[in-house]
């Protein structure tokens, strides 16, 4: 995915978002914004239903994008910024704990490179 244009990434992100919105039953219109952040992988504004993804992480692969979008979409679905039992239960239905650990490690490594 490293050679993709930003527009190509947006298409992939839209497909992932639409698929997870359907599977999670999120009826609200959810926007995604891609920007550079030094310390954040992704975050969401629950009130505006907007997910922000770090542009520096786009080339880590589609599985990472799926994780980031799913993670933030669960926050929007549950209307909470916290990682409670419901949050983890939903997340684990889609991505195994081992895969989550692997993805998070890759994200941390990339963010550390950005900071230095």
Predicted regions and their residues:
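Active-site-proximal or metal-binding-adjacent scaffold patches in catalytic folds
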Residues: 1-67, 76-116
């Amino acid at each position: 995915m490293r050679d993709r244009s930003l527009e190509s990434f947006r298409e992939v992100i839209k497909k992932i978002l639409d698929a997870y919105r359907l599977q999670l039953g999120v009826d609200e219109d959810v926007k995604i914004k891609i920007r550079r952040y030094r310390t954040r992988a992704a975050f969401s504004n629950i009130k505006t239903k907007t997910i922000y993804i770090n542009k520096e992480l786009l080339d880590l692969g589609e599985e990472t994008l799926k994780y980031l979008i799913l993670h933030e979409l669960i926050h929007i679905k549950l209307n909470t910024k916290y990682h409670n039992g419901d949050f983890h239960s939903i997340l684990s239905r889609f991505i195994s704990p081992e895969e989550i650990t692997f993805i998070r490690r890759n994200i941390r490594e990339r963010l550390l490179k950005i900071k230095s």
